[in-house]
């Protein structure tokens, strides 16, 4: 069988097939089932504060105001406590040390970035994804895609993260 292993920025995994940060990566049990099924890595559903649960989780896309042609997912960051996610992340890395686990992060202040980075790395995250692209969560608080659209803010937060992180940082 062919060797499909990858090394991306020092993050190793048995193959290039990874789950994105989304509802299927919202917990350790789901990620372990994915690894059992052959996935090589996972980006944990975005961790941060506060936990906000929205309803409904879908918004309709209409065509000319006449008919629905699709749906938007308006789910925000994880709706599970940070401590629970970090404990499960630790267990996933313990059970699957050769699989990639990336912590997707979204917080506001420099102090919050420093704390969540250390906690994610202590839980075994192989790398950090800075969630600067999410179009439907926390924009009103200067997070998600509002950061990704402002180069100076993006540069400032990325510099904080790089100063604190010991693992690769993905922006």
What are these regions (language model features)?
Residues 3-13, 18-23, 27-171:
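Active-site entrance/lid segments in N-terminal catalytic domains of soluble metabolic enzymes
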């Amino acid at each position: 069988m062919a060797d499909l292993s990858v090394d991306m920025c020092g993050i190793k995994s048995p193959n290039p097939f990874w789950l994105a940060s989304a509802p299927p990566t919202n917990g350790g049990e789901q990620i372990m089932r994915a690894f059992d099924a052959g996935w090589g890595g996972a980006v944990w559903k975005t961790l941060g504060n506060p936990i906000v649960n929205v309803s409904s989780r879908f918004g309709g896309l209409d065509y000319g105001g006449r008919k629905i042609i699709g749906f938007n997912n308006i789910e925000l960051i994880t709706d599970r406590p940070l401590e629970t996610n970090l404990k499960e992340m630790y267990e996933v890395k313990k059970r699957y040390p050769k699989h990639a686990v990336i912590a997707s992060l979204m917080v506001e202040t420099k102090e919050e970035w420093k704390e969540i980075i250390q906690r994610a790395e202590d839980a075994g995250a192989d790398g950090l994804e800075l969630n600067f692209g999410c179009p439907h969560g926390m924009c009103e608080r200067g997070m998600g895609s509002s950061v990704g659209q402002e180069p100076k803010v993006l540069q400032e937060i990325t510099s904080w993260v790089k100063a604190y992180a010991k693992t690769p940082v993905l922006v």
